[in-house]
Amino acid sequence: MTATLERRESASIWGRFCNWVTSTETRLYIGWFGVLMIPTLLTATSVFIIAFIAAPPVDIDGIREPVSGSLLYGNNIISGAIIPTSAAIGLHFYPIWEAASVDEWLYNGGPYELIVLHFLLGVACYMGREWELSYRLGMRPWIAVAYSAPVAAATAVFLIYPIGQGSFSDGMPLGISGTFNFMIVFQAEHNILMHPFHMLGVAGVFGGSLFSAMHGSLVTSSLIRETTENESANAGYKFGQEEETYNIVAAHGYFGRLIFQYASFNNSRSLHFFLAAWPVVGIWFTALGISTMAFNLNGFNFNQSVVDSQGRVINTWADIINRANPGMEVMHERNAHNFPPNLAAIEAPAVNG
């Protein structure tokens, strides 16, 4: 009898835990995805902060020339970064217990791999948690679908690209200047500026910013007046009120007269679908472009593609970019190789002496 009561009590505790995890009445929704999201994101954040402040230099190129990235080793907020895991480790799974000591783990850039893998798992669980909460509230799943765009972009630069290049040392450093360095090197090695998927991503990001600004300004400029002409239109509203505060017909009419009639939306759902879909699809394409360039399916190379009737080259902007790429590549890993492969492959001229 005693054993039966204890079993019921334990089942009751588990049931209460399940109800708490899946409850939509709590201040912050946990969810089953949150059970995994919380520890992984806390781990990634904690290790990032500690490593950004105090991590010793990392032998990123695997040639015994460590690169400093932390604040205590001479960097500031702009130049500081979590240095990627050493090329000597490659794509090997490198937890702390795989190293002979913590010093060796730090020297080989172990924190980068730890942060990146926990972060990617955490943001994927956050996306799942968005779907889970939407499902329990009876909502449609498009919030999680929209969030899949930045998740795909992060996965591309932190996981797919290193896999394609054969080493986590080619992943994006976790810092401001490290991000810019990654972008410059990516251009030098893959000519991303001439890749159509990157162009779609730029159109998505900048177009999304433009449309967001246009929509926000139209909404805040077309209030339904609840006051007299002698009072401010803002006086008729309370922050967070349930009643509609703007007139989409007025906004549609204004924008239609500003450009032309069919340039504006007269349906709120169509408008907001467009505002969500434009940047999301653009970022999806960018992530796909990074993932294909990871395996060296690079951007277009229109090298000296325009010539006159005499066969003389007429330079285009594509040629200017091609001229800049080797220079950027020379600056990258300057001690790992003397010249980029496309320069080193050229036969050296004979020197008479």
UniProtKB/Swiss-Prot annotation:
PTM-bearing positions, type N-acetylthreonine: T2
Q: Which named protein is this?
A: Photosystem II protein D1
Positions of [CaMn4O5] cluster binding: D170, E189, H332, E333, A344
**How is the protein modified post-translationally, according to the record?**
Tyr-161 forms a radical intermediate that is referred to as redox-active TyrZ, YZ or Y-Z. C-terminally processed by CTPA; processing is essential to allow assembly of the oxygen-evolving complex and thus photosynthetic growth.
Which E.C. number(s) belong to this protein? Answer: 1.10.3.9
> Phosphothreonine is carried by which residues?
T2
Record keywords: Flavoprotein included? no
**Entry binding sites for pheophytin a:** Y126
Residues that span the membrane, as ranges = 29-46, 118-133, 142-156, 197-218, 274-288
Catalytic activity, reaction form: 2 a plastoquinone + 4 hnu + 2 H2O = 2 a plastoquinol + O2
The protein's assembly and partners: PSII is composed of 1 copy each of membrane proteins PsbA, PsbB, PsbC, PsbD, PsbE, PsbF, PsbH, PsbI, PsbJ, PsbK, PsbL, PsbM, PsbT, PsbX, PsbY, PsbZ, Psb30/Ycf12, at least 3 peripheral proteins of the oxygen-evolving complex and a large number of cofactors. It forms dimeric complexes.
Note one Pfam family from the annotation.
Photo_RC
Cofactor note text: The D1/D2 heterodimer binds P680, chlorophylls that are the primary electron donor of PSII, and subsequent electron acceptors. It shares a non-heme iron and each subunit binds pheophytin, quinone, additional chlorophylls, carotenoids and lipids. D1 provides most of the ligands for the Mn4-Ca-O5 cluster of the oxygen-evolving complex (OEC). There is also a Cl(-1) ion associated with D1 and D2, which is required for oxygen evolution. The PSII complex binds additional chlorophylls, carotenoids and specific lipids.
Q: How does it sit in the membrane?
A: Multi-pass membrane protein
Its annotated compartments are: Plastid, Chloroplast thylakoid membrane
If you read the UniProt record, what top EC class would you report for this enzyme, in one word?
A: oxidoreductase
Instruction: Spell out the residue numbers of the propeptide.
Output: 345-353
- Residue numbers marked as site, Tyrosine radical intermediate: Y161
**Source taxon at top rank:** Eukaryota
What is one Gene Ontology biological process annotated in the Swiss-Prot or TrEMBL record? photosynthetic electron transport in photosystem II
